[in-house]
């Protein structure tokens, strides 16, 4: 008798037929601690142990995407196994799909473009295997990959749901599709519907684009019409919201997740692989740079130096108090102002706190800018259509400054004509930093490389390092691991008088 038999339960789950002893082993194998769980009310009230269990002992089910992990478990533990789960045969060869993408007549900025090999390969893998977790870095053209996927499925009379993390990205995805197919009979306004705040929840178009916040609380009947679901920037989703939506899209055998990185994800990699399938590594940032498909990057780590009195003051502060000290430091803000104004070409200044840092920086920079130089402030409170308009304006400007919140501009927002990026606020998140860097890596006709100015603050006193300096060390480790060229420059904060 076979120890483990894997069968299809539905489009989201497989059933593992095995005895109870093996079921408990599988449960342990697919259990992990949730980062930060100990800070949640449920954990503190002892109503939850802070773990996620992906294998259900009672129903003996687990996500379809972890099928290969179950097989690996069986092999490792010496159990005999059978798998009766097979993807839907799309009867599509790689050559046929390549020819199909060529027939779509992709354009960008009114110029005909050909999809790169890794874009075609990524899209084809998701169709052939019915599901895929596409790992493709910022500036690699994920929207073109998604466009080719939805064009194939809609050509087969399948409806597609695209889920993105922000309202800005709903507008941008829609605009990208309009750009790609501007010379095609396939018109975006006839085939795609945007769900934004206050808009009717329409699912009658071939393609629906929405944030997960806009559809999370809708009933399963809204999702029943979709055959394919694609989640962009899926690393940003919290486990509860993303699994809730994916469980409602019960009639969709085709499931695709796109992400630029799996390091430090809010949703554990096992959950993402379970929901979307095996990881498909499309390309690396280094490969894109080596092939001149994205701009080069020069990282300047600017380490601000402070007086002994300030260092002794900060050593007594907790993390939040240190942040408060930095964002209200007039000389530091003046330094950021002078740096932004002295840069040539378009510059993006990224901050964390809107009221206490973003708005003061905007007022400081805008009041000192030369007449005619455009300075924009972008944050979550700015209307999505206005943000999209600012993005388009910047594409045609040569010397604009965008002061933007990390939350809005660190993810997905595409500006080709961007030459300088300034990190005005500290962060150690690998995901956020790489996504933010990506804002400046897109190629344009007048750019060979992007300059990143990473501002950090050395407020260490004797052997005690301040919190944000430790974050800076983590960012430098990221630059080294990605193979970026960087240099470290000490600057006296009084230079920002």
Predicted regions and their residues:
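Conserved helix-turn-beta segment of the N-terminal RecA-like "Helicase ATP-binding" lobe
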Residues: 168-194, 368-372
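Walker A/P-loop
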Residues: 128-152
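Conserved segment of the helicase C-terminal RecA-like domain
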Residues: 439-473
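Post-DEXD/H (motif II) to motif III coupling segment of the RecA-like Helicase ATP-binding lobe
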Residues: 235-300, 479
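Conserved pre-motif I regulatory segment
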Residues: 87-135
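Conserved helicase ATPase core of P-loop NTP-dependent helicases/translocases
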Residues: 171, 191-202, 359-360, 373-410
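Conserved interdomain hinge at the start of the Helicase C-terminal
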Residues: 314-352, 356-367
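A short beta-strand element within the Helicase C-terminal
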Residues: 224-227, 404, 413-426, 435, ...
